[in-house]
Regions:
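Regulatory and interdomain segments flanking nucleotide-handling catalytic cores
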Residues: 1-134
Length: 134
């Protein structure tokens, strides 16, 4: 069984326009700082973050609770102007966990609306984890 959390920057496109016409360096620096903070926050909880796209990340989050996710969201909120949504999925394998997270967000299945956290949680860490490779 695997629990997977997908993190996506909300309002990324419109936000990039606020940086002006010469913004690529600003975007690159923001993305690297955000990735660093995500990796730092999740690794403290024994998880690993992967970059999916410039505005999307995913993490294997077996054992993380809703409160753990909220704590990370609070850390991010205090550090960045941009916001992230989190979609948590749970399944027999990474593919099923990804589908579960996607469906939860698509159907607006909130676990915590204030911090934009959608999904399904297991919260157990005793299961072995299968890592997916993109």
């Amino acid at each position: 069984m695997i629990q997977l959390t997908i993190m996506k920057i909300t309002g990324y496109g419109p936000w990039t326009l606020t940086l002006g016409s010469d913004r690529e360096h600003e975007l690159q620096m923001l993305q690297s700082r955000l990735y660093h903070k995500l990796q730092e926050s999740f690794s403290k909880k024994n998880c690993l973050v992967f970059l999916n796209r410039s505005d999307e990340y995913f993490s294997v989050t077996n054992g993380l609770t809703l409160d753990d996710h909220i704590t990370i969201q609070k850390e991010l909120e205090s550090s960045f102007d941009v916001k992230l949504s989190m979609s948590i999925g749970y399944g027999e394998n990474p593919y099923d966990a990804n589908l579960d997270a996607y469906e939860a967000k698509k159907s607006q299945k909130f676990l915590n609306e204030q911090y934009s956290i959608f999904g399904t949680l297991n919260g157990h860490s005793e299961h072995s984890v299968t890592i997916m490779h993109l």
